[in-house]
Amino acid sequence: MIYNIYNKVANITLFSLLILFFMSSCSDEMSIKMQYGDRDQLFKQKYEPIPGPRTCFWRRGPVSKDPYINIAYPDAGVFYWNAAFTVPEGAKLYLEGEFPHARYMSLISYDGRGAPIESLADYLIIPNHNSTNPFIDGSKRKNRNRSYKVEIVNLPPEIRRKEGTRIDLKSDIKDSNIDKNNSNSNSLNAAQYGNGQQSIVYRIYVPDKNRNESGGVPLPEVVLVLNNGEELRGEKACDALRSNQAPQISIDAIGLPMTVYSKLLKQPGKPDTWPATVPPTWYLQYDREFLLGIYNGQLPKSFRKSTGGFYPNLDNNYVRTIINRKHGKVFVLKGKLPNTPKTFHGDEFMSKGDMVYWSICSNQGFANTRVNDCLFDEQVPVNNKGEYTIVISRVEDRPRNAFPECGIGWLPMADDGDGAIDEDVTVIQIRNMLSSPEFKHAIQNVSDIGKEKDIMGPYLPFSFYTTTGAFEVLFPCMN
């Protein structure tokens, strides 16, 4: 890295000297005064720190859409923090925190390729004595006493919980006296990988309006109990955990290497719009092989859903399609929105729904893994039947009626497309989080590749390409 910077400086300096020579040879009156420090002026930029809270343990984050750290396909309505650490031999690691004022929170452990190990979702966490878990169906969301304590264990999961679907627990009750004898325990399995590294991601979905990134509460505090009984907190705990260690992840954990991505795009015999089809083709998210299979046709080796992305959330199931602006500058989706809890405006009680959360995102390509923007359920304009129309286009092509005032949602395409090679590529992704067992149209219920529409029905949107003018005349706005 230092070598590259030095070369750039040397090249710029040489370029400046050549200009000096040229100008001096043209006119004796022209001169350039080279002063010490001029080189530094070329590289001066205003320091702008990444917004949002961090701690010595939660060092990496917040990850979200711009201006936050934008990598690994974050949902724009979500904030993520990562911790990489090593629990000393014989020690015990705990996280003490308060439930945030938000739609959802979780702690999820990962391996060195960014594949999830286990999720501990909010509703599975038993609160401390005299505290309330506000994520339990029917709970009061604004109670002040909302603390919890979770142990992080260096073990692989003994039993894999059903993923993506909300489990019906005894704790789904309105009061705070949760049955302490239920099958859930406040622990997360975060097995070591590489040279003893452990990794977890803390997520907060849709903080209540006017709350900060962490949902109006501090980030969970790390507590380390050594094998001699000594308790460490704060910086001392972080030092013992080596929480400043470099991540031991594979090169494709947060995005495909450019060499791999380039080969996927430039396959012999494929059109320059590949793999975008007309009409669009939707793909479930299984493992990494099937993610690449969108381009090369390979099938999944594992049918465990939601593991093939870049640090995916086990509580979500995903479908995605890849679109290409060469097929049309305006992409339209028409579908039906599932019922979800309403929380953004500080609703008093946590309600049930078809699922906990729904969103649709416009993203860049698999090498870039940047999100352009998303709409989550409470942001989507719907008619009295719960149906939506969403437009995806560049800003310059946005129809004048593609605004909430006209009952139309809108998401941007990036001007540089996939952010790497093809300026016309956009990746569209839909999330279904913790669906109810009673809701039969969730992504979670699709078990066969190619049967997405059969199961999801109107909840998998009908979509098509068009032009700005055509959309404006097809969907007149009376406002």
Model-derived features with residue positions:
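Bacterial N-terminal signal peptides that target proteins for export
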Residues: 2-13
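Bacterial N-terminal signal peptides
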Residues: 13-21
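C-terminal motif of bacterial Sec signal peptides marking the signal peptidase cleavage site
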Residues: 23-25
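C-terminal intrinsically disordered regulatory tails that are low-complexity, acidic/proline-rich
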Residues: 27-29
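A compositional/structural signature for long, glycine/proline-rich flexible linkers
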Residues: 32-479
